[in-house]
């Protein structure tokens, strides 16, 4: 293949007679794409299938983390970091711990059934194509380099002179400046090969950047879904009375009450929103395992009732336990709708709590600290 090449939608290289992709200094050929053979991906662990791991790990994570916070709570191990006193949990909450646990288990059953239907709607996940996909990205990187001589020319730089001056000391950089010209890089049968930096960048894009973007978009979808539906349930009196008011029986949140909801609300707000994020971002099943588990951890942490200074989830985002606790108080119930990851929508739509700091949980925490001393 010569420099008149492009990449098809499936990533394969194709010659296009009579056209060129930008101006290059030399006739260049694209390295060939490797062949691949697909096979069904084996399970991550021999003792449990990925199907069941995806369904059950978020439930296990929920209860392990919740019971850890519960142990801290009932043993009063870190009173200085409490948002509320133990007495408040007993006096102000309008639902028993048993009822909370019962309703959470019901929601998790609905969650598992929905997750099973979602997973069964997906085709079997295959492996064996990753090397090919990385090579496709490396090819795109090589083709993108063909624009460099033109770009440099636009700012008055001579790509030919620069490339020649770099050839002895930095041959790979010289090749990039020349528009992706690497005559010394050859593979089997004297075919063109990719530079090491091209492969490293391609692998970084494929294995890190793309999944990171998927996770970020997934989090943004969940935040958007939950913000507007959550806010609607406060604005619409009928929805609040019949569904969302159940969650607000917990004026003093605690960890395993994170998913204490009316079953209809739990399905619409939590389960369906996560399913939409999974589908839209086209995550793999294993990506879903991590995404759903991390979402569960964040949700539990936001309801834990503690403001630990060393908690990474409460450091990296302002949407934390103290932020959400404000929403559970009668003086903050019409604010702080955002959950579970960021506060973007509260900030943009001016629903972030801006009342007196004397009402905030920090005041409760100060009283607890005085009592502990």
Question: Which residues make up each language-model segment?
Answer:
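Extreme N-terminal flexible tails
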Residues: 1-197
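Cytosolic/stromal cytosol-facing helical appendages immediately following the last transmembrane segment
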Residues: 2-44, 48-52, 69-92, 235-373
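Aromatic-acidic/polar surface patches that form glycan- and anion
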Residues: 53, 57, 214, 218, ...
């Amino acid at each position: 293949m010569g420099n008149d090449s492009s990449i098809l939608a499936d990533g394969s290289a194709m010659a296009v007679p009579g056209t060129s992709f930008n101006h290059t200094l030399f006739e260049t050929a694209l390295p060939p794409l490797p062949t691949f053979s697909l096979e069904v991906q084996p399970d991550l662990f021999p003792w449990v299938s990925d199907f069941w791991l995806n369904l059950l790990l978020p439930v296990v994570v929920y209860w392990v983390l919740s019971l850890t916070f519960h142990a801290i709570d009932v043993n009063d191990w870190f009173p200085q970091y409490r948002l509320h006193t133990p007495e408040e949990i007993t006096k102000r909450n309008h639902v028993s711990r048993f009822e909370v646990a019962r309703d959470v288990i019901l929601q998790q059953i609905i969650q598992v059934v929905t997750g099973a239907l979602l997973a069964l709607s997906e085709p079997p996940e295959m492996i064996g194509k990753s090397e090919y996909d990385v090579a496709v990205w490396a090819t795109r990187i090589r083709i993108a380099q063909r624009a460099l001589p033109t770009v440099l020319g636009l700012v008055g730089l001579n790509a030919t002179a620069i490339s020649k001056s770099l050839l002895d000391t930095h041959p790979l950089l010289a090749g990039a400046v020349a528009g992706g010209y690497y005559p010394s890089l050859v593979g089997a049968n004297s075919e063109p090969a990719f530079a090491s930096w091209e492969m490293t960048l391609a692998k970084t894009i494929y294995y890190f950047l793309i999944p990171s973007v998927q996770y970020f978009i997934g989090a943004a979808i969940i935040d958007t879904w939950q913000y507007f539906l959550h806010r609607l349930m406060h604005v619409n009196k009928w929805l609040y009375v019949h569904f969302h008011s159940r969650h607000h029986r917990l004026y003093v949140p605690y960890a395993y009450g994170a998913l204490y909801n009316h079953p209809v609300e739990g399905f619409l707000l939590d389960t369906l929103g996560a399913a939409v994020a999974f589908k839209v971002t086209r995550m793999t099943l294993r990506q879903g395992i991590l995404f759903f588990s991390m979402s569960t951890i964040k949700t539990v942490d936001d309801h834990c009732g503690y403001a630990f200074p060393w908690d990474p989830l409460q450091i990296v985002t302002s949407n934390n336990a103290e932020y959400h606790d404000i929403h559970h108080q009668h003086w903050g119930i019409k604010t702080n709708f955002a959950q579970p990851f960021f506060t973007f929508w509260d900030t943009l739509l001016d629903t972030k709590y801006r009342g007196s700091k004397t009402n905030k949980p920090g005041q409760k925490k100060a009283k607890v600290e005085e009592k502990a001393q």
